[in-house]
Amino acid sequence: MITIRIDSLIELMDRVAPPELALPGDRIGYHGPEIEVEAVLVLMDYLEDVAVDGYDLLVLHHPPEVEPPIPYLTVHSNWDVADGGACDALADALGLDVESFLDPDTGVDRICRADLSLEELLERTGVLNPETLRVVNPREYVDRVAVVSGFGLSDKSLIMRAWSEGVSAYLSGDLTHGPAILGRNMDLTLIDAGHHATEMPGLHRLREVIEDFGVMAELLDTGTPWSEYRAAYI
């Protein structure tokens, strides 16, 4: 493993996740002074109880809600969109072949060939270790699946695009009541595997990319930011 100047590391990262791919208003980029980087910690979210001793740099997927104590680089929607980035990592983890996009203007999604029973597709989500799976409009067979890393089921416009593109199922996270009703009325199968679970393949790949640069990188999975309680406790 090597030691690298932060500006050189940023230049390498910009090649795999170009900043111009980021969605408008996304708070990506480097925050910190000029440093030498020997050890990197990759996180989905920075939490104040995360031990950062021994690391020179945090590489974060989500922009932090509180300021970390050491320099950090946020790689968010530009990594979701990038060729080989988070959305492609999700499709690869599920064993799906990418064929096109729901939203070619942003590239924040992937449409994949499937030719699977719904049960087979749900079994494949086991590699994501989802806390739960929520399914709207179960069907026996799916031939084309749209996937979005993280937030996709909260976006009604993407659900509308999935329906208009004729996909049989749309898999992502962050499903809420309104989008679920929209999908149900459209007879579109929605599969909510969770924001965290659908983003983890992209985080593993991000760590691998940094190590491919020759820099020591570790990934810490901080999990979902809540605990689930069943009705028996209410």
From Swiss-Prot:
Record keyword Metal-binding present: yes
Residues the entry annotates as binding a divalent metal cation 2: 62, 195, 199
GO molecular function, one term: metal ion binding
Family annotation (SUPFAM superfamilies): NIF3 (NGG1p interacting factor 3)-like (SSF102705)
Pfam family of the protein (one): DUF34_NIF3
Gene Ontology cellular component terms for the protein in this record: cytoplasm
Bilayer-crossing regions: none
Keywords, alphabetical: Metal-binding
InterPro entries (UniProt xref): DUF34/NIF3, DUF34/NIF3_sf
Binding site for a divalent metal cation 1: 61, 80, 199
Subunit composition and interactions: Homohexamer.
Family label: Belongs to the GTP cyclohydrolase I type 2/NIF3 family.
Protein name: GTP cyclohydrolase 1 type 2 homolog
Organism for this UniProt entry: Methanothermobacter thermautotrophicus (strain ATCC 29096 / DSM 1053 / JCM 10044 / NBRC 100330 / Delta H) (Methanobacterium thermoautotrophicum)
